[in-house]
Structure formats: structure tokens, C-alpha cells
């Protein structure tokens, strides 16, 4: 009785419904509440009758979305069961398609929804995810099929489904993506377009994840082959065809395209694809236009001076340490040339990874005064692993402070060996570096930054040091308000204590010690900001493919990368001449009107004057000795000093 009553109520409700508009724009606001981007609403669809739809489009759509559309009713129980089975099998074989041997693709999860259900969701239902909404979907689908023929419903689907890039309906999609009429599209183009409604923003081959779009295209082709609509040769040829995309879209004029793309990705992850595509959202972001401008200008200006060193690109990210909010995100210098956001792409960090290695050491009872050997060492392996310092020289026994400040390679590998690769990886994960493959087979070279990580993760790790061991959650969205004025998302404050404040301060003390780093970097490098306390570290890979500078003040953490998107090598570009000048310019620019703040020193540290040559206590309380910081109970005592001196008597 209840079921019948519910059906009648929703069926009556359906009679008075009008299709919702998918043309409402989303508005992006910066941290000051000013609009910096509006995603233009989709233009009304250019309608096409089912008689004028090319057979290729019909075959591709039915094969990939609902192959039994003309045989089943509004709901397809067999399709739901089949989808559940496929999803189960995919989970068992890690996403490999039954056509993976043909196309080397990953299978898309099956939803089980019929074309009628998809149409209902697109034009009649809200974005809420609830049991009530699912019941409405079923009732509306039955009512739609009761009033319309299958051809009418299929025609409505093709004309009203959203394909991304402000294209409502497949005719508009054809023009926006390829600049062609629908009947002019090739198999390669059709198979790309018909797969887009599954996730229009993410799968857009123009502004989304192109690799994901290609995988979706391969899925469409595999389904067409499975349904015997095309041959294997046709499928393979279409998959290998280079698409001539019509990139002259509204996106070309976006002011901060990399940031906008990243915000959209975050929105899809947090709210779902439908919520964003339906429009009408007011998205309040963390972007500071002033800081973004400083970052862009510094990177563009400096890279222009490095052309003779084969440098074409730079990326940078600025994080507010107090809030974890991203104030600037520069994913590259030219969005029209490359839409790859380098701040979220994996690259080798080189020596900028060493603070993570030494943090692992501090977590395992080593100290800033622990001595490590800096000399020619064969660490074994085939071929033998014999790391060298950048300048080719060696300095004998050095303290951890000296080794890290001067970015000496051999001691970093030695520390990696002492604590173990696994503990280094766990420390990286602790600090927020999730992009490093925890299941990868890394050797001791991980201590020199041979593993690939993202700039965003590295900024998070360094910000953890700045926050005395509280790891921030980098965010680009503060809140989202929907078309009805309801706040549907509010970014929670999220800092997590992951590191002893004393260990964080010891690391900051080393990275901000300009006197200690003078041996390699000199006393007046671009890693200092006058009398403003700042901690910094450079990184350059052996092949000169990546050049980094990471650093922080109490207020901001800034990470900069310089290199080439295609991983081609730069011409012998040292760390201080690559990313560091950009980092210095950004740091100076964003702190120009800020008061000087010292790094907060936590309680409980032991302080002992230490000789940098012996790593032991000294009665001489001045340079070159250093006032070293220790966790309680880890400082060397005077007896160790006397034992050391006796050997010279």
C-alpha cells in the first residue's frame, strides 16, 4: 500500500515538473570576496531529430551507455546485475578490462542506469544523494517511458545531456570540441564525445584529465567492438588517432587557469560531478590575487633569463601556514601550451627531500650534532652505488647540521642507511607526502630525492616544520553556496599533530642557519631574507631535469620548481641559479608589508654549545661553535668530550 501510494504521489508530481536549466553559471570568488572567474552557463542545445543523428553516434552511445535500451523498460534489472558483477570483477583484478589485452585500458565502473534514468537525472532531479531521490528517479523513468516512445527519449537524451565545456547536447559538443557538424565526426571523435557525460569536467579532452578521457574513449570503442558495431582494426585505428581539438574555448581567457582547474577537481571530489555541472554555485576560494601576481611575475621574469640553459617552465605554490590555505598556485608559465599542473605532478625533488631524511634520523635518536662521514663510500649494489657531492669534494666527519645545511650527499645516504629506507618513507608519509609510492622499491638513493613527489606535498611537509609539527591540510576552497543560498560545503579547520614540536624546531634551526651553510652556499645567497628569519633548502636532480627551492617563514611556505615538462635536461643549472631566485623574489614580495616574526621555540629543548668539528660540547660559546638544540636526554655530555680529547695526548 505504501509503495503504491508513493508511486502515485511521485507520478502526480512528475506531471507538473519542467526540465531544470543546466545553463546557470558557477562563480568563483577570491579570498577577498571578489569575482575572478565565472564559468559561463551552457548555451541552449541545438536540437537534432533522431532521424538526423548519424548511425555511428547512435551505435557508440547505445553500446557504451545502454546496449539493450530498445529491449528493456525504464529500468533494466539485468543491466543492474550485470553492472554489479562487472564492478565486482574489476575490483578483483584491479580495474583491468576484458579488452585490456587489446587496448591496455582500465575499465570504467558500471552504473547500471538506463538512458531513460540518465535523462531523468539530468533534467528533472536535484543533486542530493538520498534514497528518496533514487525512488523519484525510478518513478519518473517509468512515467517518462509511459508517455514517450524510445526514439523520443533517446532524442531527448542526445539533446539535453551535458558534455562539458559549456556544451549542452551532442550537437553543441561536436562544435565546441571539434568545430564540426555532427555528421562530419569520425569514429575517433564520436567515441571521445559520447563517453564524456560520465564525468564531463574531468573527462574533457580540452581542460580535464586527457589520459582519463582517452581511457574512456577506449572503453567506448571496446563496447562498440563487443556489440559488433565496429571491427577490431577500426577500434585500434580510432584509439591511435590524434584528435584535432578545438582548443579555442572560453578557458583560454581564464585568469588563473591552473588554480581554477584544481578547484574544479576538488569540487568534484567533495560534492560530486553533478553538483558542479548543474551550475548556480558560489565558490569562495583561498586565492590571494596579489600573491598570485607576485608569483607569476617572479617566475616569468626569471625563466626568461634561463633560455640559454634550456629552461622553459616553472611552477610555484604559496601556502598560508596558519590556515593551510593555498594563496597562489602557478602550475606552469603558459596554460595554452601545456595544461599540466606541475604543482600536482610527480617530479624528483633532489636534495630538497633531505630534511625528511634527517627528520627520520631525529625520530630515531640521532641529533643535530651526530657525526657522519663525508667521503668516498661504496654503498654496494650492482653497479656499485658511490654517491658524490655536487662540488666533487669531501669534508671528512661532519655534524648533521653541517651536512644538511650544505646539502652534502654522502652523509644523507649514510643517514638513510642508518635509519632504513622504510622509516624514511614512513616519515615522508607522516609529513603529508602521499604522492611518493609507498610500495615502490627504493634504494638508498631515496635519501637524495630519487623518488617522485608533488610540489604540493612538499609544501605541506615544509609547512609542518613551520607549524611546529602540526601538519596542515592544504585547501583551495573555503565554502560553497548553492543556487538556493544554502551553504553546502564549509572547509573544516584541519591541522594534525604529527611531529614533536621540538624536532620541528631543530629542523627549522638547521634550515635557517645561514652561517652553517656558508661552506657551500656562501654567506650572501638568495636563501636568506636579510634580517627576516627564514628556513630554506634547494634541490637539483643528478640529470638536471628538476630544480627546486623550498622554504618557509612563520607566516608562509613557498615551493618553487624549475625545469621542462617533457623532463628534458637543463644545462648544468645549479640550485641557487634555478628555482632559488624565483623563491627569493616571491618571499620578499609577499612579506613586504608584514612584520618580522621569529620562529617560536618550544619548551623542553636542551641547549648545549657544540663544536662543529667534533660534534661534542665546547666551553667556547661563540662561532664557529654553535648553540645546538637537543631532545631531552640526547645531548652529548662533557665526558664524551674528554674521551675524544684523550686520543690526541
Predicted regions and their residues:
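N-terminal type II signal-anchor transmembrane helix
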Residues: 1-29, 68
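Residue-level preference for non-acidic, small/hydrophobic
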Residues: 33, 61, 119, 153, ...
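Short pre-catalytic segments that frame enzyme active sites
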Residues: 34-46, 172-176, 196-197, 201-206, ...
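Flexible, acidic/glycine-enriched loop-and-adjacent beta/alpha segments
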Residues: 49-115, 169-171, 380
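Conserved catalytic neighborhood of penicillin-recognizing serine enzymes
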Residues: 89-129, 183, 249-255, 366-424, ...
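Non-catalytic, structured segments within soluble enzyme domains
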Residues: 107-293, 297, 426-429, 433-438, ...
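Glycine-rich, acidic and aromatic/proline-enriched surface loops and short helix-turn segments
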Residues: 121, 125, 159-166, 183, ...
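A penicillin-recognizing enzyme superfamily signal
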Residues: 285-308, 318-320, 329, 334-345, ...
Amino acid at each position: 500500500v505504501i509503495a503504491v501510494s508513493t508511486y502515485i504521489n511521485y507520478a502526480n508530481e512528475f506531471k507538473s515538473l519542467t526540465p531544470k536549466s543546466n545553463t546557470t553559471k558557477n562563480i568563483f570568488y577570491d579570498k577577498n570576496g571578489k569575482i575572478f572567474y565565472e564559468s559561463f552557463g551552457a548555451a541552449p542545445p541545438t536540437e537534432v531529430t533522431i532521424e538526423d543523428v548519424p548511425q555511428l553516434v547512435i551505435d557508440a552511445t547505445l553500446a557504451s551507455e545502454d546496449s539493450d535500451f530498445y529491449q528493456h523498460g525504464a529500468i533494466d534489472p539485468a543491466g543492474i546485475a550485470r553492472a554489479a558483477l562487472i564492478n565486482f570483477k574489476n575490483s578483483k583484478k584491479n580495474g583491468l578490462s576484458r579488452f585490456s589485452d587489446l587496448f591496455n585500458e582500465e575499465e570504467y565502473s558500471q552504473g547500471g542506469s538506463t538512458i531513460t534514468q540518465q535523462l531523468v537525472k539530468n533534467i528533472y532531479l536535484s543533486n542530493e544523494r538520498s534514497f528518496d531521490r533514487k525512488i523519484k528517479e525510478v518513478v519518473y523513468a517509468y512515467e517518462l517511458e509511459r508517455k514517450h516512445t524510445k526514439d523520443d527519449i533517446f532524442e531527448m537524451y542526445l539533446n539535453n545531456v551535458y558534455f562539458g565545456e559549456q556544451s549542452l547536447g551532442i550537437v553543441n559538443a561536436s562544435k565546441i570540441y571539434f568545430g564540426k557538424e555532427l555528421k562530419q565526426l569520425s569514429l575517433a571523435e564520436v567515441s571521445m564525445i559520447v563517453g564524456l557525460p560520465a564525468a564531463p569536467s574531468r573527462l574533457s579532452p580540452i581542460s580535464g584529465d586527457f589520459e582519463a578521457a582517452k581511457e574512456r574513449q577506449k572503453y567506448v570503442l571496446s563496447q562498440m567492438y563487443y556489440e559488433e558495431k565496429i571491427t577490431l582494426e577500426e577500434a585500434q585505428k580510432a584509439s591511435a588517432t590524434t584528435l584535432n581539438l578545438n582548443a579555442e574555448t572560453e578557458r583560454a581567457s581564464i585568469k588563473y587557469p591552473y588554480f581554477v582547474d584544481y578547484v574544479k577537481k576538488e569540487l568534484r571530489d567533495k560534492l560530486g560531478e553533478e553538483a558542479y555541472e548543474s551550475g548556480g554555485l558560489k565558490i569562495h576560494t583561498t586565492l590571494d590575487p596579489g600573491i598570485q601576481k607576485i608569483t607569476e611575475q617572479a617566475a616569468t621574469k626569471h625563466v626568461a633569463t634561463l633560455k640559454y640553459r634550456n629552461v622553459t617552465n616553472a611552477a610555484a605554490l604559496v601556502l598560508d601556514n596558519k590556515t593551510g590555505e593555498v594563496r597562489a598556485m602557478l602550475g606552469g608559465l603558459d596554460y595554452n601550451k601545456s595544461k599540466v599542473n606541475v604543482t600536482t605532478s610527480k617530479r624528483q625533488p633532489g636534495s630538497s627531500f633531505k630534511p625528511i631524511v634527517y627528520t627520520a634520523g631525529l625520530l630515531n635518536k640521532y641529533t643535530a650534532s651526530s657525526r657522519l662521514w663525508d667521503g668516498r663510500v661504496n654503498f654496494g649494489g650492482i653497479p656499485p652505488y658511490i654517491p658524490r657531492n655536487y662540488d666533487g669534494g669531501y669534508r671528512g666527519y661532519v655534524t648533521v647540521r653541517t651536512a644538511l645545511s650544505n646539502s652534502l650527499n654522502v652523509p644523507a645516504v649514510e643517514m638513510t642507511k642508518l635509519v632504513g629506507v622504510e622509516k624514511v618513507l614512513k616519515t615522508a608519509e607522516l609529513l603529508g607526502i602521499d604522492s611518493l609510492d609507498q610500495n615502490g622499491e627504493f634504494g638508498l638513493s631515496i635519501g637524495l630525492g630519487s623518488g617522485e613527489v608533488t610540489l604540493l606535498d612538499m609544501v605541506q611537509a615544509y609547512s609542518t616544520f613551520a607549524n611546529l609539527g602540526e601538519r596542515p591540510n592544504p585547501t583551495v576552497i573555503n565554502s560553497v553556496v548553492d543556487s538556493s543560498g544554502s551553504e553546502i560545503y564549509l572547509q573544516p579547520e584541519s591541522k594534525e599533530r604529527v611531529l614533536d614540536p621540538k624536532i620541528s624546531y631543530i629542523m627549522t634551526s638547521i634550515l635557517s642557519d645561514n652561517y652553517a651553510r656558508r661552506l657551500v652556499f656562501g654567506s650572501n645567497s638568495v636563501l636568506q631574507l636579510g634580517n627576516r628569519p627564514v628556513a630554506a633548502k634547494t634541490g637539483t636532480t643528478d640529470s638536471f631535469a628538476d630544480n627546486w627551492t623550498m622554504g618557509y617563514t612563520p607566516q608562509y611556505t613557498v615551493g618553487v620548481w624549475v625545469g621542462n615538462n617533457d623532463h628534458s635536461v637543463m644545462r648544468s643549472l645549479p640550485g641557487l641559479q634555478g628555482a632559488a631566485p624565483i623563491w627569493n623574489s616571491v618571499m620578499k614580495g609577499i612579506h613586504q608589508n608584514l612584520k618580522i616574526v621569529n620562529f617560536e621555540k618550544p619548551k623542553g629543548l636542551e641547549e648545549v654549545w657544540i663544536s662543529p668539528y667534533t660534534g661534542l660540547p665546547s666551553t667556547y660559546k661563540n662561532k664557529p661553535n654553535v648553540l645546538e638544540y637537543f631532545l631531552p636526554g640526547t645531548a652529548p655530555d662533557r665526558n664524551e668530550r674528554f674521551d675524544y680529547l684523550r686520543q690526541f695526548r
